[in-house]
């Protein structure tokens, strides 16, 4: 990929997303699409009550238009992998939109039930995996970072594993979306990691267009989502991002890299699981002051901006480690 091929998707997506925000936020305010805040969260978060949600539509639009405008040559040549990744993420975005719509409609912080979300997400994951296998883009050879080796799995085992990873990733990103600018800031380095992969790894230029558009879209969204946020991405945005992260990892055929680039998502999710499990086992005791992890640090006295900065730095470190973990794969 040349310099312009790297930069252009970022810039175009940033501009489109920023413009979309100017139009979308007033519309969301007019429609009274305000976020309902959980009463079990930090009390000072109640001041965020009514902030427009579903803002993820901004970068979904920005990314979509960018890959159509800049990726049409690849599509004319019969290469659709970047479009598949986008459409897969979009399906999760639609699931999130339905959830957000239910919350806004009923003015409550509960939308779809956990079972409804799981069934829809699992169906989307299976459909994506079947499409990728049909197109010859999926392999049961599981790449192991650092060792530059593969574990050959039976197809059935691999597909079950892959579906679990996809649904888990999507929900982990969703859990991370709890502070102004947190999920978007943490995901920018991950998008950059996948963009770098497209630059150094011949044959993945199409994914570079999507990854660049993802980075630009998130930066455009942060114009409005940084503290104090004028808009939240909602489940519309967070489920889209989770779908995008999972789809990119499988499109590059290295899903285990998510352990490194998604270290923040994993820590957030584990803190939630550990807190709930320990609470039940000990009949009311807690390990963390509040879960997920970003709320724990808030309760320790950290400002939102500090939590976001530190978590983003951890994400950057995870992505740098991930680069060296897979370096041997493309350094031949």
Residue ranges, per PLM feature:
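Juxtamembrane helix-capping/reentrant segments at transmembrane boundaries
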Residues: 38-52, 107-120, 294, 299
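Membrane-interface helix termini and inter-helical loops of multi-pass transporters
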Residues: 74-77, 105, 136-150, 330-332
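Hydrophobic transmembrane alpha-helix segments characteristic of membrane transport
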Residues: 98-106
